Amino acid sequence: MAKAKFERNKPHCNIGTIGHVDHGKTSLTAAITKVLAETGGATFTAYDQIDKAPEEKARGITISTAHVEYETANRHYAHVDCPGHADYVKNMITGAAQMDGGILVVSAADGPMPQTREHILLARQVGVPALVVFLNKCDMVDDPELLELVEMEVRELLSKYDFPGDDIPIIKGSALAALENKDPKLGHDAILELMKAVDSYIPQPERPIDQPFLMPVEDVFSISGRGTVVTGRVERGIIKVGEEIEIVGLRDTVKTTCTGVEMFRKLLDQGQAGDNIGALLRGTKREEVERGQVLCKPGSVKPHTKFKAEAYILTKEEGGRHTPFFTNYRPQFYFRTTDVTGVVHLPEGTEMVMPGDNIAMEVHLIVPIAMEEKLRFAIREGGRTVGAGVVASIIE
């Protein structure tokens, strides 16, 4: 069967449902596709189709994720939903499913629960820019004061983790009512109201091509008579021939000029996000550039050695460690294209980290890496992946 053509006429946004187990994330995902299918913006995907999500591998970690797509009048959405709590943790930390925003689902009957808190914290740590709340199962709560109480609790919890709890839209409804065509106010209409909130409150992400230029260095060649060529895939932005760039990471930052861009052996006047290019650098010797550095727009990225991270440590079954590790653990941290040794400092009160845990930790690298918040990395021992992480904040 041929795939339907992906119409690129609307801005695209990646979102996902997060929240405690059994609060209705998957039912809500199904309900959104059902309600939007009426206007031709989606294909109805039933609960059991979403729930048996296929397994995917991201950075050597197996994650089950369901993907649905739909559109509103304003945007095209790719929506991810995970069957299990561990899948959420892995998904958010590896960035396997990039989230420009999230729909936090909270059962009105139960209020915020441990995973509600953990998913909000994870969203904060991994840099999900905005959340919208769907207060689900409102048809099970008769007392309006109780609903208000739950809403207040959710807002307080969001504020505690530095989300704007007072401003975040909270939509009250019932995913089940929408799926079973009952109580349109809590069902059908609430879903439309939720999508309106998602449309307006979750900011449109900046496209990679509009961001400042950055390209991780994969390989370096010397071409006699022409100079040094650096190859890699442009991560974001545009590099034009004649522009000044910086080489950042592993050693002192150097400024140089890009005197040529090649792709498939053809000369171009620019390379852009997604392109695999060779960049010719003026006056740069081959030994001055190495894999693991980045080429970038001057001043846009700085080299750092100390940062706070959120990490997931693989289980033995996932091919990870068989034993716990302690503070001063020294694995390699794989950033973009290279491994750098670093020392792990565990937070106060955390004695050790077991395989299968996710943990906030501080890392001190032995050499600097071009780094910014939200940058993903793998934790490796002798080339074997034992964990995945994301830079939560930079210390120095």
Curated annotation (Swiss-Prot):
Gene name of this polypeptide: tuf1
Tagged with keyword Manganese: no
The reaction(s) annotated as catalysed by this protein in its Swiss-Prot or TrEMBL entry are: GTP + H2O = GDP + phosphate + H(+)
Q: Binding residues for GTP, per the UniProt record?
A: 19-26, 81-85, 136-139
Function text:
GTP hydrolase that promotes the GTP-dependent binding of aminoacyl-tRNA to the A-site of ribosomes during protein biosynthesis.
Return the broad EC class: hydrolase
Where are the stretches annotated G2? Answer: 60-64
For this entry, the protein name equals Elongation factor Tu
Q: Which organism is it from?
A: Rhodopseudomonas palustris (strain BisA53)
Q: How does the record describe its quaternary structure?
A: Monomer.
The record's keywords, sorted A to Z, are:
Cytoplasm, Elongation factor, GTP-binding, Hydrolase, Magnesium, Metal-binding, Nucleotide-binding, Protein biosynthesis
> What NCBIfam families has UniProt attached to this entry?
EF-Tu (TIGR00485), PRK00049.1 (NF000766), PRK12735.1 (NF009372), PRK12736.1 (NF009373), small_GTP (TIGR00231)
Family, according to the entry, reads as follows: Belongs to the TRAFAC class translation factor GTPase superfamily. Classic translation factor GTPase family. EF-Tu/EF-1A subfamily.
Subcellular locations according to the entry: Cytoplasm
